[in-house]
């Protein structure tokens, strides 16, 4: 019961006051399966990209962290090819930093910061980490290329996904709405902050 009421509050807050460049919504109307989008930050190799994440909420939430992974491929030392994310806030102590006082919004913001500032000393992808440390121009070039190939919206406001199936005709529409929401949220924040 605590999990459901907490998730409802968090989703209301994420809808009313999302972090800049972030949007989050229920997947198929299920409260324990969410999707989020993060807009790549300015002056990063991910700039202009919209990255979709899958979020699974465990039964023991908030005493156990949400499971998050990127659905959009991203070239990053702390994110592997399956989309898994190496971030302390997604792990329980003693190895991690998850606490029940953290929430989905906080973790999404932490992921956004990790995208802007990779941690090459705690990598999931050793080869990308080495590139980041010793050949940063090559890392930046590859990360920009991956962003252009996988995360840049081909049609204005549309995020292409592998989830488009005849059974789920509304998926494209909801992704279009959320992609615009994340981008509009970022643009609104820029206007307010300037």
From Swiss-Prot:
One of the GO biological process terms: protein polyubiquitination
GO molecular function, one term: ubiquitin conjugating enzyme activity
UniProt EC number: 2.3.2.23
Location(s) in or outside the cell: Nucleus
Domain UBC core: 2-152
Keyword Cell cycle belongs to the record: no
CC annotations in GO: nucleus
The keyword Chaperone belongs to this UniProt entry's keyword annotation: no
Involved pathway(s): Protein modification; protein ubiquitination
InterPro entries per the UniProt record, alphabetical: Ub_conjugating_enzyme, UBQ-conjugat_E2_core, UBQ-conjugating_AS, UBQ-conjugating_enzyme/RWD
Catalytic reaction list: S-ubiquitinyl-[E1 ubiquitin-activating enzyme]-L-cysteine + [E2 ubiquitin-conjugating enzyme]-L-cysteine = [E1 ubiquitin-activating enzyme]-L-cysteine + S-ubiquitinyl-[E2 ubiquitin-conjugating enzyme]-L-cysteine
Active site (record annotation): 86
Record's function text: Accepts ubiquitin from the E1 complex and catalyzes its covalent attachment to other proteins. Catalyzes monoubiquitination. Involved in DNA repair.
The protein's name: Ubiquitin-conjugating enzyme E2 T
Species assigned in the record: Danio rerio (Zebrafish)
Gene that encodes it: ube2t
């Amino acid at each position: 019961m605590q999990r459901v009421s907490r998730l409802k509050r968090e989703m209301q807050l994420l809808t009313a006051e999302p972090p800049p460049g972030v949007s989050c919504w229920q997947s198929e109307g299920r409260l324990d399966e969410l999707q989020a989008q993060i807009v790549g930050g300015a002056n990063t190799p991910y700039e202009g990209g919209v990255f979709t994440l899958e979020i699974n909420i465990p039964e023991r939430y908030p005493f156990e962290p949400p499971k998050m992974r990127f659905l959009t491929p991203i070239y990053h030392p702390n994110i592997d090819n399956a989309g898994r994310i190496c971030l302390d806030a997604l792990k329980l102590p003693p190895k991690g930093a998850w606490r029940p006082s953290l929430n989905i919004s906080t973790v999404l913001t932490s992921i956004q910061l990790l995208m802007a500032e990779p941690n090459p000393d705690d990598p999931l992808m050793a080869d990308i980490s080495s590139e980041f440390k010793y050949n940063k121009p090559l890392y930046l070039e590859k990360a920009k290329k991956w962003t252009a190939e996988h995360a840049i919206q081909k049609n204005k406001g549309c995020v292409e996904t592998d989830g488009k199936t005849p059974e789920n005709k509304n998926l494209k529409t909801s992704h279009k709405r959320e992609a615009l929401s994340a981008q509009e949220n970022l643009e609104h924040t820029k206007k307010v902050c300037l």
